[in-house]
Amino acid sequence: MKRKDDDQEDRSCSSASKLDPIPLDLKMATVPTKSHMKKSHQNKLEEDEKEDTNPSKLELDSLPLDLKMAILTRIPAKSLMKLRCVSKMWSSIIRSRGFIDSYYAISSKQSRFIVGLSNAAFNEPEKQLTFLFSFSHEDGEKSSSSSLVPNFEMAVPCSLAGLSHSLASFHGILAVEGKVMCNPNTEQFTTLPVGTIFVGYDPIDDQYKALGFDFDKRCHGNAIGHKVWTLGGGEGMRQIRGDLAPYRPILLPNVCINGVIYYGAHTLSQTKDPVIVCFDVRSEKLSFITAPAVVLQSGMKSILIDYKGKLASIVRNSCGGCISSFVFWILEDPKKHEWSRQSCDFPYSLWDYVGNVRICFFGTNKAGEIIIAPMFLSRDVRSFYIFYYNVETKTMRRVRLRGIGSDIEFRRSYGSENKLCNCHVRIAHQHVESIAFLKDHINLRT
């Protein structure tokens, strides 16, 4: 009965609370490289300030630079994008590395999550889009049951239609299925090199890199080599060599934790032992971590996530097509390859809210709660829920994402009206707002 009331509330929202149709403004660009606000840039800001002689700006421009930056850090990100047009000096401040870092540090105290909806109604790649919506984690973490209102951010020209396709956030920049990187706040995106499989971020050097494979032509699917692109600095693709034996990657979403990309694989030995492949983004070194056989399973029966800075695997147990429980494996010691495990039960009431739709585990929030949500919008118009599972207390709470797929107008606007095609859902957890300009930071050469 509660779900029906929620649906009724969604449909009765005033027009002011509904999402607007798609304001498509897709911009090509390029992504982030490391730099700091050096003295030369300080001089540039002062020069820009001298050039702006409009009397209406003099009062603001006479403020000390530190005070100007302190004021600007309190302004919403998308409003800052408009303020770039006020003067050259304001634009220089907003685009400076020092200000970008300060803004990110403040934004990191209030993380958000991004929901990506990908329509599969068109076969032509150029017509496939992923729509990105942002939500605040803060309200949901303070109550046992609540609803959140979405903000439409932007659309990017790629699809999330595959089971292994993922949406991930790296230091304020989103990676959409190894094809596109974008910043929702600047509404810029850039296409990743062809052949990219995974994207990782090194927090020490503030560097993004893409990883791809060379596959054995005689036995497709066996990785026998690796190629890397540095997303920034103008470097082209390069081969990296390691002493790893050939292996076959498992089609699972990867996870990047503290500058290391983790993904599943099977060795090509007679026993086909499951392993976790580790790629250190900074050193570009590869290594194996052995894992229990059940930790890595294809077909989304298991999934790797970041749990409080540790690699974890969730292995689902099904009963009658519904997940009844899951086993939670945590890599406690990467050097000794030691794992811990615990069993977690699902309350059957969850299925009252998601219907007959496959669910997935999309990482955790800052509190360490596992985020669970449907992988598709229901083909019937109904409210969309996500769930937070606390592994320590074995409790779960639900949060309704208002407006997402809950009325026909939304579905028509965002390409999910066709009941014959799935609208795919992916979630990037713990996203932090950044105002980094892609064209200032990622310079791709393939």
UniProtKB/Swiss-Prot annotation:
Region named Disordered: 1-57
UniProt superkingdom: Eukaryota
InterPro entries referenced in this protein's UniProt entry, alphabetically: F-box-assoc_dom_typ3 (IPR013187), F-box-assoc_interact_dom (IPR017451), F-box-like_dom_sf (IPR036047), F-box_dom (IPR001810)
Biased composition (Basic and acidic residues): 1-12, 43-57
Record domain F-box: where: 57-107
UniProt cross-references to CDD domains, sorted A to Z: F-box_AtFBW1-like
SMART domains per the UniProt record, alphabetical: FBOX (SM00256)
NCBIfam families: F_box_assoc_1
Protein name listed in UniProt: Putative F-box protein At1g32660
Organism: Arabidopsis thaliana (Mouse-ear cress)
Lineage of producing organism: Eukaryota, Viridiplantae, Streptophyta, Embryophyta, Tracheophyta
